[in-house]
Amino acid sequence: MQLPDRLRRLIGQDASWSTDHEGASGTALRVVSGSKVFYVKHGPLASAEHLRLRWLHGRVPVPEVVAFEDDVLVIADVGAPSSEAAAPADIGAVLGRTLRMLHELPVTECPFDGGLPAVLERARANIRDGLVDPDDFDADHIGLTPEMVYERLLATRPHVADLVVAHGDYTPSNVLVPASGEPVVIDVPALGVADRYRDLAIVHRDLSEDHGPTAWEEFLSAYALVDHIDEERMYYYRLLDELL
């Protein structure tokens, strides 16, 4: 990765770079420079995340933006494990309280569009660019092609939406749990105004698979923003996630 001169000086010439970290991906690098630890991302998603982190600052706990230049984002290490790694006994309640905090933000103040038309277009582009691996689909979708999933999404599109400021990828790995203080929300390039079920479907899938029905019940109790679950929208947004 080519760093702008200012960012190179900020990080330091002798910094150690690694992709070996929790939630490692090709777009996030962990950088250790003396006593400081940063995460560095680059590209269009880094630019999108930078804008969202700036907006979220002071509204919900998020990592500190250290610097941003030429589509390169430098974020301070929070120094805390994800709820997925820490697996606290009350993980459902932790995730429920944190998502409630996000979903209670006024949608009229959020400048980012996470609505279905924009997300379906992103899904279509992912198929076109060969970025969807059907081998990673949930068990009940094995055997479907990405094109079949997309056609099903178009045919069963919900006619209602309960709009909130949605994370867009609300999984246990994207909520950090410091030893003290509030949980910290990370990886927010997809954040925007969207149906709350975009988040509920994903966290339900992960909690149910890894922690069982009790964790989901504890989540709902702590979240406390819905009186009943719309199972059709839960399924729809889980299906949509296969293409994202």
Model-predicted regions and their roles:
Residues 173-177:
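Hydrophobic residue at the +6 position relative to the catalytic HRD Asp in the kinase catalytic loop
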Residues 57, 99, 103-107, 208, ...:
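Protein kinase-like catalytic domain
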Residues 25-27, 35-102:
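A conserved alpha-helical element in kinase catalytic cores
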Residues 1-12, 49, 242-244:
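Regulatory N- and C-terminal appendages and interdomain linkers associated
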Residues 8-33:
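ATP-binding glycine-rich phosphate-binding loop
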Residues 162-165, 178-229:
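Active-site Asp-x-Gly
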Residues 225-244:
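Charged phosphate-binding loop/patch that engages nucleotide di/tri-phosphates or the phosphate backbone
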